[in-house]
Structures are given as C-alpha cells and as structure tokens.
Amino acid sequence: MAISRGDKVRVKRPESYWYNEIGKVASVDTSGIKYPVVVRFEKVNYSAFSGVDGGNNTNNFAEAELEAV
C-alpha cells in the first residue's frame, strides 16, 4: 500500500523520537531520495534551545519505516 499525503501513519524506526507515535503525512517526494516521506506530529521533540518552548514537529522517513493506520 502506497503512502500518500494526508495519510495517518505510525513510525516504526526504533531510534526515532517518535517511535510508535502517529503522525500525518505532509508530503511524499518522488525524486528517489532515501527518506522521501515528511511526517508531521502533534508533539515537538527535544531540539529546542534551552529556555525556549518548541522544537521540531516534522521528520523524514522511508516508506518501509511507516505503517498506515
């Protein structure tokens, strides 16, 4: 099953901050890059500067690292 924009997916990359979290596909690149699927999440990760709220809420994944829900 091909993943497309707007699909809800579960992350299956064990080293990812969002492992087993559900996100929404923001875009899928078809140019042949290694991690073509951009996934957006509700919560942010830990990459914000000290004392500043926020962080990243998107990340790139390969289709094999995602499971449609």
Curated annotation (Swiss-Prot):
It is found in: Cellular thylakoid membrane. The keyword Lipid biosynthesis does not apply. Keywords: Membrane, Photosynthesis, Photosystem I, Thylakoid. One of its GO terms (biological process) is photosynthesis. Pfam families: PSI_PsaE. It is a peripheral membrane protein. Transmembrane segments: none annotated. The keyword Membrane applies. Gene3D superfamilies: 2.30.30.50. InterPro entries: Elect_transpt_acc-like_dom_sf (IPR008990), PSI_PsaE (IPR003375). It comes from the Bacteria. GO terms for cellular component: photosystem I reaction center; plasma membrane-derived thylakoid membrane. Stabilizes the interaction between PsaC and the PSI core, assists the docking of the ferredoxin to PSI and interacts with ferredoxin-NADP oxidoreductase. Belongs to the PsaE family. NCBIfam families: PRK02749.1. This is Photosystem I reaction center subunit IV.
